[in-house]
Amino acid sequence: MEAKLSPGTGIVILCAVSTAFAANHVAARIAFDHGGSVAAAIVTRAAGTALVLLLMMKLRSVSMTLPPALRGRLLLAGVLVAVQSYCLYSAVALIPAGLALLVFQTCPMLFVLLSWAMGKETPRPQAFAAMVLALVGLALALNITPDKFSAQWSVLGAGVIWAFGAAVSFAFVYYMNSHSLKSLDGRLRTFAMTAVTAVLVLAGGSMAGSLALPRDATGMIGLALLTVFYCVAMSSLFFVLPRLSAASTAALNFEPIAALILAWIFLGQTIAPLQILGAFVTVGAIAWLGVAKK
């Protein structure tokens, strides 16, 4: 039995993990701005993560046998992760990273709605309230008001659609992980999905001729860092989450806020004070939804 971490320590660690996830997206934007393609970034990140997870499992002597009944479901989950990865990185390439991640934060809401639709959970007024509050905050963060809708949508629309597509895809992955794939070791499950993602995007990118690497050293550093940050964050979760209380995991919702800060520092991406307020409202509402669910 692993020793539990105190709530304060857990929150600090998860905020650091969230910052690493956010840094991965900021580094990805640097790679994109210097000629790297979305497909190349996904293949690099997925392959690196799969290798790290494979090493972790070897060191811990984790069985790598996949039950035959779950192989098809794992393949489907891998396809969904590939779609999610492509959609989210495409969004990051088009709009500020923090805003892309805020739209992606609708994923927990979609997961709850899917669980309700499938009869796995009972609708609750508290959850409805959290969802409405999150959407209000998102509208503020995107600066989408009736008088500015057309102008803002012309600038942000494509990125918002990509990010929402990522949220939809990952909501189905969440659902599969919570139900049909729940019996698998988390490391093996993540390794399989990540490996499928790497193979699919590599094959698709090769056929489409869209595996362009960054054209200069700055872009290559961005490509390397996005892989490092993601691998560190993902592997850390497997060590930290088993030692935390359910309520502490709400700190993972810090990722969009961290992305806004990092993008401001390293990319010069700025948003208005009202948009920052909207970001905090959205993150707070999603955290509320998660804590209430647990």
Which residue stretches match the model-derived regions?
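Transmembrane alpha-helices of multi-pass small-molecule transport proteins
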Residues: 9, 33-83, 110-114, 133, ...
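Membrane-interface helix-cap regions at the ends of transmembrane helices
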Residues: 30, 34, 49-67, 135-153, ...
